[in-house]
């Protein structure tokens, strides 16, 4: 049973403040073992800087409600006209209510269907070919159409120990989120259909 009844929600009009990210958890019987959405990273690889990148940045900020971070080329590729250090991509990381809000809309764009190969231990990634498929987005002929990738990371309480600055530590093997638990989270909490190989 999904955390919310998606048939009662208009994904075009929903706002992050309408959601509570704490409700989107998979209860595994112990409070420290529950699984929740840690982050949703939205990536656009444009492959060039200039006007097209600026248009993509405008589209991404409309989609996510956040200002994107510019990602730089790691090396020069003469054939593609890319120089090292040149901005060629965009990234936005969403957390909590905003992460759930965007993820529901992104999943609606792919019909709440994901391939089994998209999952690994605690993560799932999928792509959307055209941003206009996302509910609530609109087509602007001056900007064009862009595709993007969505990467979702799941976590349990206590995962902060691997990211904090002081007394950093690894998360134990038994406490990590497995691939099977990741698939179960998306099926049970978000109502996603999994396409088998």
Curated annotation (Swiss-Prot):
**One GO cellular component, as annotated:** ribosome
A GO molecular-function annotation: rRNA binding
Transcription regulation among keywords: no
Its BP terms in the Gene Ontology are: translation
Q: What UniProt keywords apply to this chain's record, in alphabetical order?
A: Ribonucleoprotein, Ribosomal protein, RNA-binding, rRNA-binding, tRNA-binding
One family from Pfam that matches here is: Ribosomal_L5
InterPro entries with a match to the protein in the record: Ribosomal_uL5, Ribosomal_uL5_arc, Ribosomal_uL5_C, Ribosomal_uL5_dom_sf, Ribosomal_uL5_N
Name the job this protein performs.
This is one of the proteins that bind and probably mediate the attachment of the 5S RNA into the large ribosomal subunit, where it forms part of the central protuberance. In the 70S ribosome it contacts protein S13 of the 30S subunit (bridge B1b), connecting the 2 subunits; this bridge is implicated in subunit movement. May contact the P site tRNA; the 5S rRNA and some of its associated proteins might help stabilize positioning of ribosome-bound tRNAs.
Family under the similarity heading: Belongs to the universal ribosomal protein uL5 family.
Give the record's subunit note.
Answer: Part of the 50S ribosomal subunit; contacts the 5S rRNA and probably tRNA. Forms a bridge to the 30S subunit in the 70S ribosome.
- Can you say what this protein is called? Large ribosomal subunit protein uL5
Q: Which organism is it from?
A: Caldivirga maquilingensis (strain ATCC 700844 / DSM 13496 / JCM 10307 / IC-167)
Q: Give the gene symbol.
A: rpl5
């Amino acid at each position: 049973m999904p955390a919310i009844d998606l048939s009662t929600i208009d994904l075009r009009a929903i706002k992050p403040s309408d959601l509570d990210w704490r409700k989107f958890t998979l209860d595994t019987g112990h409070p420290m073992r529950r699984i929740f959405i840690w982050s949703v990273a939205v990536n656009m690889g444009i492959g060039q800087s200039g006007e097209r990148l600026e248009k993509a940045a405008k589209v991404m900020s409309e989609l996510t409600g956040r200002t994107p971070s510019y990602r730089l080329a790691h090396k020069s590729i003469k054939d593609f006209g890319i120089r090292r250090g040149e901005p060629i991509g965009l990234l936005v990381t969403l957390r909590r209510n905003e992460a759930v809000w965007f993820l529901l809309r992104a999943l609606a764009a792919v019909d709440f269907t994901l391939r089994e190969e998209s999952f690994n231990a605690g993560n799932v990634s999928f792509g959307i070919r055209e941003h206009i498929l996302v509910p609530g987005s609109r087509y602007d002929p001056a900007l064009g159409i862009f595709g993007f990738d969505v990467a979702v990371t799941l976590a349990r309480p206590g995962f902060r120990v691997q990211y904090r600055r002081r007394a950093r530590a690894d998360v134990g093997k038994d406490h990590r989120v497995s691939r099977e638990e990741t698939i179960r989270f998306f099926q049970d909490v978000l109502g996603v259909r999994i396409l088998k190989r």
